[in-house]
Amino acid sequence: MAKNIQAIRGMNDYLPAETALWQRIENSLKQVLSGYGYNEIRLPIVEQTPLFKRAIGEVTDVVEKEMYTFDDRNGDSLTLRPEGTAGCVRAGIEHGILYNQEQRLWYVGPMFRYERPQKGRYRQFHQLGCEVFGLQGPDIDAELILMTARWWRILGIADHVKLELNSIGSLDARARYREALVAFLEQHKDQLDEDCLRRMYTNPLRVLDTKNPQIQVLLNDAPVLTDYLDDESRAHFETLGELLTQSGIPYTVNPRLVRGLDYYNRTVFEWVTTSLGAQGTVCAGGRYDGMVEQLGGHATPAVGFAMGLERLVLLVQSVNPDFKAQSGVDAYLISSGAGTQIAAMQLAEKLRDALPQLKLMTNYGGGNFKKQFARADKWGARVALVLGENEVAAGQVVVKNLSNGEQDTLAQADVASRLATLLD
């Protein structure tokens, strides 16, 4: 017997029992995006490797250790996308939709990072991202956060996520802060672990994000980034806080929040939860006003966020188990006897025309009525439609409510209205 081929570690299959909930959650997210006037953009999974090195930063963990990179047959270096923002910016520049224009875009799909698989973190994972171009005020930052808060209310998880905010200022402000932080870290080199020593000169702000508890205590005495903010960034951040407060969105200022990608400036934010064990990020984003120019376009303000769908699904399942997708089908069409198969197919198509949202499954593969009713139960059908030779000859259908066993024989023309009533 041939050896079974398994899925790659950290790259998961999602079976129909799971995808129904995914679809309901995704549809809820998309409905809100549409209501705010955001439009979908579809992007390639594979991009040229230099795109991510320039956008994300050469000395980030993502570029140094986590990207799936390979050479194609022409010798070009390609990478499976580890995140969506860089590709979205590349597409906007390439197709000329950013310069002197306002764009509100969203995308959803798989991303790839070579990480150690664990609960809610996988090597192939799914993100929904949202990007806004051409608006530089704190009001659009606030709208993005308000939109995410609306999602949490719809999904029933609002009490289980908390908003953390910070401003990392302008490039000049960060350069001044970087000097002060490096000077502080140099005074305490003997207390730093190997990872922080490596980051101290290449990407010192990432030291603030360390998970080492001893270094976290040390950092309590480190310089604070907010003390180095330029006046414009400070005013931007203060106005954002006022807008959120007036909108009833509570938040905490986290001075260590810097995000793991180099392209951010000014506003950064994360929605975090402790309901999945250790604190985890559900949604994160911020401003990246320099990226469009950095990738070859005209200077364009930009802000956005990304949300990991695996972690979101886990959170909904954990804290709001009543948020379920409809399982099974609405109706199961049973037929037996000479001439009933084509009659069943024709009836099914008419019902789908009349009720476009109807989930109707037709029995194929034969079987007596008992076996077909068993299949209807297996698929979770709420109603059975029965066609025998007598019903076909009379132009009728038996409609049986499978929850209480009640049934009626109706003319075929009346079946759609009865189904609509039963399934309402």
Swiss-Prot record:
<dbReference type="GO" id="GO:0005524">
    <property type="term" value="F:ATP binding"/>
</dbReference>
<dbReference type="GO" id="GO:0006427">
    <property type="term" value="P:histidyl-tRNA aminoacylation"/>
</dbReference>
<comment type="similarity">
    <text>Belongs to the class-II aminoacyl-tRNA synthetase family.</text>
</comment>
<keyword id="KW-0547">Nucleotide-binding</keyword>
<keyword id="KW-0436">Ligase</keyword>
<keyword id="KW-0648">Protein biosynthesis</keyword>
<protein>
    <recommendedName>
        <fullName>Histidine--tRNA ligase</fullName>
        <ecNumber>6.1.1.21</ecNumber>
    </recommendedName>
</protein>
<dbReference type="Pfam" id="PF13393">
    <property type="entry name" value="tRNA-synt_His"/>
</dbReference>
<dbReference type="InterPro" id="IPR015807">
    <property type="entry name" value="His-tRNA-ligase"/>
</dbReference>
<dbReference type="InterPro" id="IPR036621">
    <property type="entry name" value="Anticodon-bd_dom_sf"/>
</dbReference>
<dbReference type="GO" id="GO:0005737">
    <property type="term" value="C:cytoplasm"/>
</dbReference>
<dbReference type="InterPro" id="IPR045864">
    <property type="entry name" value="aa-tRNA-synth_II/BPL/LPL"/>
</dbReference>
<dbReference type="GO" id="GO:0004821">
    <property type="term" value="F:histidine-tRNA ligase activity"/>
</dbReference>
<keyword id="KW-0030">Aminoacyl-tRNA synthetase</keyword>
<dbReference type="InterPro" id="IPR033656">
    <property type="entry name" value="HisRS_anticodon"/>
</dbReference>
<dbReference type="Pfam" id="PF03129">
    <property type="entry name" value="HGTP_anticodon"/>
</dbReference>
<dbReference type="InterPro" id="IPR004516">
    <property type="entry name" value="HisRS/HisZ"/>
</dbReference>
<dbReference type="InterPro" id="IPR006195">
    <property type="entry name" value="aa-tRNA-synth_II"/>
</dbReference>
<dbReference type="InterPro" id="IPR041715">
    <property type="entry name" value="HisRS-like_core"/>
</dbReference>
<keyword id="KW-0067">ATP-binding</keyword>
<dbReference type="InterPro" id="IPR004154">
    <property type="entry name" value="Anticodon-bd"/>
</dbReference>
<comment type="subunit">
    <text>Homodimer.</text>
</comment>
<keyword id="KW-0963">Cytoplasm</keyword>
